């Protein structure tokens, strides 16, 4: 049975999930839950949508001479002066590397460990997978995005004169000017533009753009459709978030393409762990990500003030 279908009632989906637990099929229940959680992370997480992630194999790990923490060693981008890694829990303090190669450390992200009676699970009237999303996916997603954006902000702070621009914003033309400044910012660093990240409300501001800024066809399309479902501005891919603690309104982050900027690995992708004891179900989600930024110049921020 598919846990993603909208054609089956929540009661039937929940019953199928609980029946697996009652039948000793914890592994199957974990697989179904893990698949759903991973899907939602890639659909809604900021860094999961910005970059492609690859599961790394144990033979790609490199022994750490100081401890047993997992790591891999990768080449820094050819034109880069510095490289670093995203400080997930367990990776240690952030450091910058100037040599030809640098390490990517794998951390651990774990949701809160929850316990719930299967009788309580039976009483949930909405899809239990949606309940897992609210109680597991959001915790993991928040930790991923927070660790990444903290790294990005730290990089920009150390080199704000070259990687940040403030644009006075009072009319739609200023919005376009800010966007163009972001494009030019990466170009001045001798890098192409990959994707742009911003708050959803900042993206909605693009509805104020006039026909002389976006063209007649662009205006007609937006009048008919609005911006929901869009994922670009002037042909550049845009990724949005509604979390102002991750990206505040009126800020735009321009990233170089992944090949010029970062490497994203998973020692283990998000996995739902379930343990059934009598009527109690214990569960939590964990993963082991590692993200290296091979070129700290691959980011440019524009602030609209």
Model-derived regions: residue spans:
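Short, Φ-rich (hydrophobic/aromatic) sequence segments
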Residues: 32-47, 182, 252-270
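A short, structural micro-pattern
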Residues: 106-108, 190, 232, 277
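Alpha-helical scaffold segments that mediate packing/assembly in large oligomeric complexes
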Residues: 111-188, 304-305
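Assembly/oligomerization interface modules of large self-assembling protein complexes
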Residues: 35-110
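Extended, solvent-exposed, turn-rich assembly/linker loops in the middle of proteins
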Residues: 156-230
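Sequence/fold signature of self-assembling virion shell proteins
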Residues: 2-11, 18-19, 26-27, 209-305
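Intrinsically disordered, low-complexity, charge-biased terminal/linker regions in eukaryotic proteins
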Residues: 1-56, 60-61
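Helix N-cap / beta->alpha transition motif
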Residues: 114-118, 196-202, 228-230, 242, ...
